[in-house]
């Protein structure tokens, strides 16, 4: 029978989770809508003419930040209290100059993609900010190419940190060779290119997630993708038209349950309606390399995105090396893969993941230090982690650092630990997975 494996406790600084586990995961579940697609559906719907309907939108804090900002810019967006949302677009080029500061909350996607949109709307002044974490995250990676297009952006530390002020301009198209494979950088420039006259091309060193490319095409943008050169070209000015969007389940959220089922003896679960876009399935490939007993069923395409149901059972995992071109395809799953590696036979090495140091927290430091408290043999490297498998974890007092993925990854590690684990600042899970606790209670049996 399902049991209360996790207790939610109010705390002076937020919410604390207390996990006392003895059991296994069993059953079927669905997961919240994909966060990346949810953001883009709201933004493109706001910029399009006509109505956009969104089914399966993630009702997390980050998409709420996006909706809040675009309402202030003139779009009509229904309340995010159900997964069915309507957006009445204001039309590309017709954003209003807001009389408030646009607050992106904790959402790097909201802020970075929105910069490309705001910078390309001439004769308007915008001010954007975020929470303490977001205001410490690097924005220079998107501001630099926007300035090459003619954008006027000012901010702290030589125009690299929020709060930021933007004076919209008529931008010029560019060819930008991005030094990093980042869907946020690519998408920011793509949004800016919608209003520039001519072809804007972005080339990456490796493929990053391609939700923007798929959705730009669906909304009517003139876009050319060349996978051989990892480049995408947007021709502006564009005309966008409202669409009916169906958001699949977020594979980054599914990853927590995939790893939990793989490492907890006796577990056997199905996760239904998971987005399996090939630019996001690095986590599946790595788990298969590690020996996970996993199959994909009912594979289909829904609103232009590959979707499948995933069946996974407990199995003995083996250590591996995670590096190179696969990193952009699983960058958000590195924390939970580190947990999987703890229970594998042999060592696991994670390299080329320095990007994790500038996420909602320094995720390499956060995972290393907190898992060490639980008895893990894990060593932090400049761009990754060295993890010795065969762990025997003990419950401990750990901190999420206010990072949703760190907090949920620690919760999964606690399922295989002896004794009680207390996770502080666990309320951060609501950023991407508001019903994480409910799903765990549903799947857990003892």
Curated annotation (Swiss-Prot):
It comes from the Bacteria. 3-phosphoshikimate binds at residues 35-36, 40, 182, 184, 332, 359. Its EC number is 2.5.1.19. Its main location: cytoplasm. One of its GO terms (cellular component) is cytoplasm. CDD domains: EPSP_synthase. GO terms for molecular function: 3-phosphoshikimate 1-carboxyvinyltransferase activity. Keywords: Amino-acid biosynthesis, Aromatic amino acid biosynthesis, Cytoplasm, Transferase. It holds the Pfam family EPSP_synthase. GO terms for biological process: amino acid biosynthetic process; aromatic amino acid family biosynthetic process; chorismate biosynthetic process. The keyword Protease does not apply. Phosphoenolpyruvate binds at residues 35, 108, 137, 184, 363, 405. It catalyses: 3-phosphoshikimate + phosphoenolpyruvate = 5-O-(1-carboxyvinyl)-3-phosphoshikimate + phosphate. The active site is at 332 (proton acceptor). Pathway: Metabolic intermediate biosynthesis; chorismate biosynthesis; chorismate from D-erythrose 4-phosphate and phosphoenolpyruvate: step 6/7. It is found in: Cytoplasm. Catalyzes the transfer of the enolpyruvyl moiety of phosphoenolpyruvate (PEP) to the 5-hydroxyl of shikimate-3-phosphate (S3P) to produce enolpyruvyl shikimate-3-phosphate and inorganic phosphate. PANTHER family: AROM/DEHYDROQUINATE SYNTHASE (PTHR21090), PENTAFUNCTIONAL AROM POLYPEPTIDE (PTHR21090:SF5). Belongs to the EPSP synthase family. Monomer. This is 3-phosphoshikimate 1-carboxyvinyltransferase. The lineage of its organism: Bacteria, Bacillati, Cyanobacteriota, Cyanophyceae, Acaryochloridales.
């Amino acid at each position: 029978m399902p049991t209360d494996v996790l207790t939610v406790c109010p705390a002076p600084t937020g919410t604390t989770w207390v996990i006392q586990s003895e059991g296994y995961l069993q059953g079927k579940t669905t997961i919240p809508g994909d966060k990346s697609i949810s953001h883009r559906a709201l933004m493109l719907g706001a910029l399009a003419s006509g109505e956009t309907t969104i089914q399966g939108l993630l009702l997390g804090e980050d998409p709420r930040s996006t909706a809040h900002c675009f309402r202030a810019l003139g779009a009509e967006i229904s309340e995010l209290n159900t997964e069915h949302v309507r957006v009445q677009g204001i039309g590309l080029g017709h954003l209003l100059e807001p009389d408030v500061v646009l607050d992106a909350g904790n959402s790097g996607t909201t802020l970075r993609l929105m910069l490309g949109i705001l910078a390309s709307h001439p004769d308007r002044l915008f001010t954007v900010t975020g929470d303490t974490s977001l205001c410490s995250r690097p924005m220079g990676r998107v501001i630099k190419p926007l300035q090459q297009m003619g954008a006027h952006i000012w901010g702290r530390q030589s125009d690299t940190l929020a709060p930021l002020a933007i004076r919209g301009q008529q931008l010029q198209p560019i060819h930008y060779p991005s030094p990093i494979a980042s869907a946020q950088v690519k998408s920011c420039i793509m949004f800016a290119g919608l209003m520039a006259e001519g072809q804007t091309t972005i080339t990456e060193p490796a493929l990053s997630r391609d939700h923007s490319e798929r959705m730009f095409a669906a909304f009517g943008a003139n876009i050319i993708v060349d996978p051989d050169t990892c480049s995408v070209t947007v021709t502006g000015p564009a005309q966008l038209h409202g669409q009916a969007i169906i958001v699949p389940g977020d594979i980054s959220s599914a990853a927590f349950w995939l790893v939990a089922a793989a490492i907890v003896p006796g577990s056997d679960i199905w996760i239904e309606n998971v987005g399996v876009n090939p630019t996001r399935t690095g986590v599946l490939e790595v788990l298969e390399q590690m020996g996970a007993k996993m199959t994909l069923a009912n594979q289909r395409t829904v609103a232009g995105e590959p979707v499948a149901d995933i069946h996974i059972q407990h199995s003995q995992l083996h250590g591996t090396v995670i590096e190179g071109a696969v990193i952009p395809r699983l960058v958000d799953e590195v924390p939970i893969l580190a947990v999987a590696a703890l229970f594998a036979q042999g060592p696991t090495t994670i390299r080329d993941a320095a990007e994790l140091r500038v996420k909602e927290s320094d995720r390499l430091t956060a995972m290393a230090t907190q898992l060490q408290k639980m008895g893990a043999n894990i060593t932090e490297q400049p761009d990754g982690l060295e993890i010795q498998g065969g762990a025997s974890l003990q419950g401990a007092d750990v901190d999420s650092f206010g990072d949703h993925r760190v907090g949920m990854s620690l919760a999964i590690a606690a399922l295989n630990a002896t004794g009680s684990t207390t996770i502080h600042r666990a309320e951060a899970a609501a950023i991407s997975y508001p019903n994480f606790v409910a799903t765990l209670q549903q799947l857990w049996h003892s």
